[in-house]
Amino acid sequence: MSDEPRRLDRRDFLVRGGLLAGATTLAGAGGYVAARELARSEDDAQAAGSEAGKTDTRQFLLDPAYVNLTTFLLASHPRVVREAIERHRSGLDAGTALYLRQAEPMFEDEARDAAAEYLGTPAEQVALTDSTTMGLGLMYARLRLEPGDEVVTTEHDFYATHEPLRLREQLDGATVRRIRLYEEPENVSVDAIVAAVSGALRPRTRALAVTWVHSSSGVKLPLREIAAAVARANRGRNDRERILLCVDGVHGFGAEDASPVDLGVDVFSSGCHKWLFGPRGTGLVWAAPHAWDRLAPTIPTFDGSAYVAWIEGRAPTQTPAGPLNTPGGFHSFEHRWALKEAFEFHRDFGRDKVASRTHALAKRLKEGLASIRGVTVKTPMDESLSAGLVCCDVSRRPARELVERLREEHKVVASVTPYATEYLRFGPSIANQEADVDRALEAVASLVA
């Protein structure tokens, strides 16, 4: 056998898997036609990227009977994403494995390329996942640690960060330490957060696990300043001893005009089905090259070069880190393949305009809530310490009761922070208008009148 490794693309991988033997043409070409006809039959929404489309919420199929301020939990697909999903779904329904053979190699790469363009990184640094939680699990399960090494996280992080770290602690005795960054979120400051982080980093700290925007309060961490503090702590350390700044970025990704590279983080996990308005059940992990070297794959990839390595009885050393850490197996293909359209939607809208719009609506909501007697806004007013999430306490009333009354009495959809301390939570986004915010404010005011 030649020392030169054979190249095998994903199509060949599927053929070798016995799924596509003898398939030479795209079955179900009518699937494309059917999907196009279905898209044309929808209401006449403006195309993403047009001038009208920048303020036209008709791109989303949200129930007009409600003011929905919870699309940050699970996105409503904009029209271009719906069309792409239906196009691929029609092809898969008509041709199944035949369509998969034709489409999968191209559209998987297109999804990764679009994500990389949005992130401003090489595509080989991007792993595709199903969610933030999956990405965090992959990150923390196989972070290379030695006895005595520790991971520092915070008391403000979500279950999706705490639980994989707890499981890792059980598995091999890794030390996980939690710190507190602030007491009252509405009074937080950049200096206080950075001081808390700096004081927590020790010689055996190997990773700092944080969340960009806290879903418990709406606090947005000053990641650039935290990254600078980590860099100072890393002076004089070798590559293995270096502290990695690992981030759950889901409530900033798609809402903020910044990328993980801009922010100076090392590892970044996010779902694409929240503020990005991408296909439900999609996500990604990005890591810098030095950070990928510290993360071992968990689930076998279906990348063709890794399959060749298996055939030839060797390790997949030539597979780039992003594809190597993309979990293999069959998944919701039509949703992952529509990621490209989601990133294009944001590109055409303008990432800076998305952030500006999101902040403007959140500011309107925070200021309005603060003017209502009995309401304490827990999210900082400072836009450098907040994003789109807005949390508040209403006359010390149970948040769950308030959410139910808002929905039943006022047709306003809000949520409860999923933590031991519960607040009423809103998330105005580009799927909303000023009138939605005003209606929510009127509803809250009526509850405390």
What residue spans do the PLM features occupy?
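Pyridoxal 5′-phosphate
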Residues: 2-6, 12-449
